[in-house]
Regions:
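Alpha4 helix (beta4-alpha4-beta5 surface) of REC/receiver domains from two-component response regulators
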Residues: 65, 86-101
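Receiver (REC) domain active-site loop signature in two-component systems and cognate sites
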Residues: 58
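Conserved acidic carboxylate
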Residues: 11
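Acidic catalytic/metal-coordinating carboxylates
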Residues: 35-36, 62-65
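C-terminal output helix
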Residues: 89, 107-116
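Two-component/phosphorelay signaling modules centered on CheY-like receiver
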Residues: 14-32
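Acidic, metal-coordinating helix/loop segments flanking the phosphotransfer/catalytic sites
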Residues: 33-51
Length: 130
């Protein structure tokens, strides 16, 4: 029996972190949740992570900075960014830099589920969700 793909969630807001974790588990994924980018980096779970969901605005290191650091270190983890602070310039840059999906909080669970499924399956996320 194959192991369920690991979805890593990096979110400083505990409510959103736990909500996303429950949603991913309900879809059959293995999850690890981290309160900060530093916590995720310290975990060293890069190679087993099938998809990373990261908040953009976090203390210490943003989700965009986390993604850039992972890429620089050779860890190309498909990444979904979430934010409560929409910024078209950041969205455009993130998608140009390879972010798989960009979602605004509060987002519909179905939008996140679609992004994760497409990312884990190796397909392109639906255009409306990025």
């Amino acid at each position: 029996m194959s192991k369920a793909p690991l979805i890593a969630i990096v979110e400083d807001d505990e409510f959103f972190r736990q909500s996303m974790r429950r949603l991913m588990r309900s879809l059959g994924y293995t999850t690890e949740a981290f309160a900060s980018a530093a916590d995720f980096l310290a975990s060293r779970r890069f190679d087993e992570t099938a998809c990373l969901i990261a908040d953009i605005q976090m203390p210490g290191m943003t989700g965009i900075e986390l993604y850039a650091r992972l890429i620089e270190a050779g860890h190309e983890i498909p990444t979904i960014l979430v934010t409560a602070y929409p910024d078209e310039a950041i969205r455009t840059r993130a998608l140009t830099d390879g972010i798989a999906c960009y979602l605004l909080k509060p987002f519909d669970d179905n939008d996140l589920m679609d992004c994760v499924r497409k990312t884990v399956e190796g397909g392109k996320p639906p255009a409306g969700n990025s």
